[in-house]
Each structure stands twice: as C-alpha cells, then as structure tokens.
C-alpha cells in the first residue's frame, strides 16, 4: 500500500478508521458504519484509488468495527453511487484469521486483505518456539499459502476460476441477521428468517472489547478467553459430558429395551437450549388428543425411516452390514453410500433374518462401485447431487482406509486416497439429470429413483425440476447431514438448516401441482421422535438418520472417522479395531422403534391418527416466545405460512404413469435375446436405431446382472445396429453382450458398463475423419472392450 500510494505510483491512498468510541455505546457501531461509507464515497469522488479499512486505531477506548460489516457496507455504498470501479478496497483487520472470514470479505467486495494479527502470531510462535524448524518469515509464508489454498477450494466449490469473478459475487446466505443489517452490508443476500440488528451487534462488539482488558482472570467463573484459569466444569467439558450422557442413555435403552432409558435420552435432547430452527417452534393440537391405540402402528412408521448415505469404507464392514440388517428388520431402508457393496450381501436380499442388502444404492459423482449388478439389487437408486454439510464438494476417503477389500469394491488400488469430483460429469443441466434418471429406470425398472439436494435458497425451484424429471423421491439434506465425512470449514460454514430446505421444497411442489406424485425425504441431525414430527409438519414424508444410527450401533463420538482409528470399530478398516465392534442389528432396530413410538405419542397429542395426516400441517406449528430476546428476533413465519391453496395435496399420494418410462427398442432387445442367453444360446440380431432410441442395452444388462452377477452368462448376444443412436447407448451392459453400431452415437456411450463389447464404426461410404460419439462416454465403466473407428467428444473415459 505504501509503495502504491507514493507520488510516482499514480494512486492516492486514504486510511479509514474502522473503530468507534466505547462511550458511544452499542449505537456507535451503526454510526461508525455510516461514517465509513460517507468517507469512502467522498474519497472516491476525490479520485483516491486506494481505500484502506483499518482497525489499527483500536485502544482501551476504541472498539473495532467488524471488518466484514465494514467492507460490505462500503462496497454497497460505492456500487450505489456508481463509484466502485474508481477505487480499490483493502482491509487491514486483526480479526481476519481463517479461510471463511477471508472468503466472506472477498465475496463482499474486498480487493485485498491484510490479516496482520494472524501473521504476527505465527511469526512469534515460530521465533519463540525452540523446537520450531522454521523462522517467522517462513511461517508467515505458509499461513498465506494455506489461506490462499482455502480460498481456492471455496471458489472451486462454486465453480469459479478467478478471484475477479468471485470478488463481490455474494455467494452466501444469511442466518440470524435482521433486514436492517442485511440491507446495508449484504444487500441482495437471502436472509429468510431474520435475526438480530445493529443494537445486538454493537453489544457484542463492546463485550468482545471488554475481554481485551486485564482484570478478570476467570478465578471465580469459567471464561473462554485464552489465558484464563482452567475450570474443571467449564462449558466445553459440560457440553461434552452431556453428549456422552446422551449417547449412554441411548445405548442403555437399546441394550435393555428400556422405555425409561430412552425417555431420559429424548428429554435430554428435547430440552436442550435452542440449537436448531425447529427448537424455536412449538406444537399446536389439530384436535382433541386421541388414545394411542388409534394411531398407526410403529412398524408402519418405520417404513419411512432410512439411514444416511455412509459407505462401506467410511464405515467398517461390520458397522455397515449392521445398519443394513437393522433397518431391514423394521421395513426401513439403509443407504449404502458411495463405494459399492459386496455381492455376498446382495444374495441375502429378502431373507427374514440376515438380510444385509442395502435397499438404497447411491449413485455419486465418482461412480465408485456402480455396476449393473449393484443397480439391479436396489429398491431405490439415489443420485447424490450434493451433501448437506459440504455442498459443492465430492466425497473422499483417505488412502489409509482404502484396504484391499475397499479397493476391490471401488475398482481401484489399495492405499490410494479417493476423491469424487464436485459435479457429475454427465449432469450439466436439468435435462442431463432427467437422462440419468431415465438410464437408471432402464437398468432396474422396479427401483425408485431419488435425488439428493442440499437445503439452500431457491432449492424449491430445483426440486420442482427434479419432480418433472420423473424422480420418485426428493431428498433434502440439511447442514448437519454428513458431518462425519466433511472438513471442519464446511461443517462450520456451509449448508443451511433442513427446516428451510424442506419448507421451501414443500411450498414449491404444492404451487406447481407436483406434491402428490413425489415423496420428500430429509436428513440433518434427527435424534428423537419430536424431531421427526417437526419434519413431518413442515412437509417431509420420509426421514433419514446418520449420526444417531451410528450411536445406536456403538459410536461414542470419538471424532476420529477420518483417522482410521475409531476405538469402537465403527469407522475404521483396521482389523484389530474392527474386532472391538459390539453393535447389533437389533440395537439399530430398537432405536428406530423407540423413535416411532415417541412419534406416535406426539401424533396422538395433536389429535392425528397417521403421519399422512401430519405431513405439511404447518398450522400445527407456531413460533415459541423464548426467554432469550435474541432468539425472538428471528421470524419463522416463512416456514409455517399456510399454502395459497389449502386444498392442494400436502403429501405423497401416488406416482404418475409417466414416472416409469421405457425404451421401446431396449425392451424389444431384452425380449428378443434374454431367454436365448439364459438357455446358453448365441443369438445374432440386427436393428435400425434412431437418436430417439435412448439407453438401449441397459435393460438387458440389468436383467443379466440380476441373474448372473459379474459372471459371464451361458449364452451371448451379438447385435448389429444401423443408424444414429440416442444417448446412453450400451450403458450398463455386461458380459455376454456385443454391440456393433454402424453409424454414430450421442453422449454417454458405455456408461457404467461392466463387461461385453462395443464396436462403433462409420458406414462404408463415409468421407473419413468421423466423430462417432458424443461427450462423457465410458463414464464409470469398469469392464469390457470398446473399439471406436473415429473421434469422440469431451470427458472421455472418466
């Protein structure tokens, strides 16, 4: 800044004091923001090219203005005045110390950021630590590199390549700030439920400033500030004890079948301080209470339950199978997550006891383990577009957890870390998503297809598109969904509460006349029957449990999932630790039944007989009047507003006929070849094919995989096609199938093929140098041979 502001540099520079006097009280913050905006506008009009928002004037009597509020307000003032392109904003702030804060300041207009205190701190630690292998300058360089890498990661999650494109883009959503603040500092950013204003923020600034003074060292009460005296029962310890106690109560209830033990667990959760949005809501009866025997049975309710998508790899084989078997005992569903599943589990499907087959099979962006056989043994195929706690990121598993067994299931090499890309390479539009849904319904015509979305602003529009793309289930994942597989920065700062996503999805589906043909599922930290009841009243048909289901099989929240050192054998691949696993399918089933029974009591108290009667009944909810004035600043009206058409369907009724589309040529091929292959015959056929014939071969591949698995069938089918094939030609084919296409094919040729042969060549009279296939061909393919006498499109063989 000093160099740029020299006379020869061509830039004028002005330092703006980002602080206010303690004597101004809480109102001083708003006054300081207004002053900064006025000064910035005046300097910009005077031709000053560099404006530095500087909190260096902080003292005993001067309080720092939060840098994000300052830069956002100044940026928007300059934009409104038409002056933003005339000057650069530089932030010199001691509170800029982590990636999220820096990403936010860039996103709200900062051109450069100087994290002074962070740089001084790491340099001091490096210089003063006798064991340090680096000096202060190197430590500062490493911090800068780490922050830059973190910002690049944030940009990549949003699909942005340059800082110039990210700066001022405001790709954020606000939770807990009122309109009076948002309109000034974050104008245009969605803030659905409001929250605190300038007065409360000013009080927080003053409270933090008080902590800079010497005096109270925490001798009489526990303080969170660094350097204060340690208290045995400080807040973090008490919180951890509560969590451990909650886990103990739950596991005791499961072991003993004790309603009393479960009630202790439930009361501990339901009586917590406001933690989630639905904690700010209370129940309003729809009618007089009903006898419990008039409410639908627990076994009918548990059919709506599922486990979160946790892979065999993230979890040990024992833990993964226990979840599947436990859910199958009660008619629920387990989601196998991304990474495949062993065939020895497929063949247990339908057994009254010992059914270890995961009824939901996930299709994620890495396509690990996705084969025709994998799809054929699913009751539901789940397309993961995003994960609640880390939207914009793909799944990943560290190399230490990729054992021989895991590598075999995922068709990769042991010891190598696996990271799925943020996008599906065959989905770049809602039409592409519709095509994948169509593909999956060809390979397994009996399975439902679900699409997993994250709670975010405007998710309702996306959900409506998913319904029109003919999915049966729309899965809304909240910010607490999938935290065990997410980096800390994403857990803390990405995703939205499920309540916002479910409410908006419900509203959009009803307004578009789509609600009765799809089921809405949600996840995001469900623990008790009351949580489920709240989700139902906001509009969810089905409910998914992640962390709680793991606790039910022995997880003690050691938070070592990523280290492969789980002490209870739940989330590790190490044999000696897996041997310590003590969970049982009966324990998982018992927990789900406890939840269902608590839910039945809640329905009875509301005067409702079935969950269908409860779904979408927002009139049975109202905002609580809390003891905490700050909690009362939030406005949950958008969540509980009655639909514009009160007679419209509020829950799933039945699918429409078009939700089971078929490929006429694909079905004809199946009918003409399957019996011959099964009997050991070799059949040769020829068909004309047009670009309206999509996903030809998937139905045959799925049928053969269901019967023969990954083994070659007794017979073969050699099929010649002539013409221009539609999308997903020869997708999901397997051993025993040979396709020859004389002509050309669209996108996705050979997607997820596991065997067989594909030959594509131009007609004999072709002029030469032909382009024979479109984009994303052989995506996720794990076996077979392909011969192409020409060029292909992009993203080939991913």
Where are these regions (language model features)?
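Alpha-helix-loop-beta-strand connector modules within alpha/beta enzyme cores
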Residues: 63-89, 142-149, 153, 436-443, ...
């Amino acid at each position: 800044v000093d160099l740029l502001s020299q006379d020869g540099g061509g830039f004028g520079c002005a330092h703006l004091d980002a602080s206010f006097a303690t004597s101004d009280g809480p109102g001083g913050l708003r006054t300081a923001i207004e002053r900064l905006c006025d000064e910035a506008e005046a300097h910009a009009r005077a031709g000053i090219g560099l404006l530095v928002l500087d909190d260096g004037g902080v003292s005993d009597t001067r309080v720092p203005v939060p840098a994000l509020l300052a830069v956002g307000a100044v940026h928007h003032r300059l934009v409104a005045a038409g002056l933003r392109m005339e000057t650069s904003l530089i932030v010199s702030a001691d509170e800029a110390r982590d990636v999220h804060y820096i990403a936010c300041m860039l996103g709200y207009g900062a051109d450069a950021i100087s994290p002074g205190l962070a740089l001084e701190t790491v340099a001091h630690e490096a210089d003063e630590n006798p064991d340090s292998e680096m000096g202060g300058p190197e430590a500062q360089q490493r911090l800068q590199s780490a922050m830059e890498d973190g910002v690049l990661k944030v940009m990549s999650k949003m699909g942005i390549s340059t800082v110039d494109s990210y700066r001022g883009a405001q790709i954020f959503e606000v939770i807990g700030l009122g309109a009076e603040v948002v309109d000034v500092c974050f104008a245009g950013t969605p803030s659905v439920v409001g929250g605190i204003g300038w007065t409360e923020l000013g009080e927080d600034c003053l409270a933090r400033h008080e902590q800079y003074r010497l005096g109270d060292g925490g001798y009489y009460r526990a303080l969170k500030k660094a350097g204060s005296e340690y208290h045995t029962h400080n807040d973090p310890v008490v919180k951890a004890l509560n969590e451990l106690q909650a886990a103990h109560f739950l596991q005791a209830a499961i072991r003993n079948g004790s309603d009393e033990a479960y009630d202790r667990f439930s009361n501990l959760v339901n009586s917590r301080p406001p933690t989630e949005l639905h904690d700010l809501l209370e129940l309003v009866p729809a009618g007089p209470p009903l006898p419990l025997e008039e409410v639908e049975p627990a076994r009918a309710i548990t059919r709506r339950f599922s486990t979160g998508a946790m892979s065999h790899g993230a979890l040990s084989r024992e833990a993964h199978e226990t979840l599947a078997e436990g859910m199958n005992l009660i008619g629920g569903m387990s989601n196998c997550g991304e990474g495949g599943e062993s065939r020895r589990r497929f063949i247990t499907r339908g057994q009254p006891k010992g059914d270890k087959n995961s009824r939901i099979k996930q299709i994620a962006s890495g396509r690990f383990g996705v084969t025709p056989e994998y799809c054929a043994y699913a009751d539901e195929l789940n397309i993961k577009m995003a994960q609640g706690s880390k939207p914009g990121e793909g799944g990943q598993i560290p190399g230490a957890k990729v054992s021989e067994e895991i590598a075999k299931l995922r068709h990769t090499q042991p010891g190598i870390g696996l990271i799925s890309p943020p996008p599906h390479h065959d989905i770049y539009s809602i039409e592409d998503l519709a095509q994948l849904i169509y593909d999956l319904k060809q390979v397994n015509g009996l399975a439902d297809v679900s699409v997993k979305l994250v709670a975010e602003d405007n998710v309702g529009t996306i959900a409506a598109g998913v319904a029109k793309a003919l999915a049966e289930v729309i899965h809304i994942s909240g910010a607490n969904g999938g935290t065990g597989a997410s980096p800390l920065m994403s857990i803390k700062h990405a995703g939205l509460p499920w309540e916002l996503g479910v409410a908006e999805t419900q509203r959009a589906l009803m307004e578009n006349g789509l609600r009765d043909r799809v089921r809405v599922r949600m996840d995001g930290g469900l623990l008790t029957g009351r949580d489920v009841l709240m989700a139902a009243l906001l509009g969810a048909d089905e409910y998914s449990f992640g962390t709680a289901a793991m606790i039910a099989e022995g997880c003690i929240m050691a938070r070592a999932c990523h280290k492969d050192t789980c002490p209870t054998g739940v989330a590790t691949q190490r044999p000696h630790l897996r041997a310590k696993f003590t969970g049982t399918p009966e324990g998982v089933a018992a927990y789900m039944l406890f939840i269902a029974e608590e839910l039945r009591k809640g329905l009875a108290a509301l005067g409702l007989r079935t969950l269908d009667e409860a779904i979408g009944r927002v009139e049975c909810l109202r905002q609580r009047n809390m003891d905490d004035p700050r909690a009362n600043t939030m406005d949950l009206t958008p969540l509980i507003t009655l639909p514009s058409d009160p007679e419209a369907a509020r829950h799933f009724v039945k699918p429409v006929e078009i939700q089971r589309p078929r490929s006429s040529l694909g079905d004809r091929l199946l009918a003409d070849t399957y019996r011959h292959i099964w009997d050991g015959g070799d059949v040769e056929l020829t068909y004309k094919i047009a670009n309206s014939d999509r996903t030809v071969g998937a139905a045959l591949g799925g049928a053969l995989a269901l019967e023969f698995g990954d083994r070659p069938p007794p017979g073969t089918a050699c099929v010649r096609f002539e013409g221009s094939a539609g999308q997903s030609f020869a997708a999901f084919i397997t051993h025993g199938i040979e396709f020859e296409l004389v002509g050309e094919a669209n996108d996705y040729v050979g997607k997820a093929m596991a065997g067989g042969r594909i030959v594509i060549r131009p007609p004999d009279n072709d002029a030469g140098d032909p382009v024979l296939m479109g984009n994303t061909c052989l995506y996720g393919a794990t076996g077979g041979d392909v011969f192409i006498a020409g060029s292909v499109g992009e993203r080939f063989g991913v």
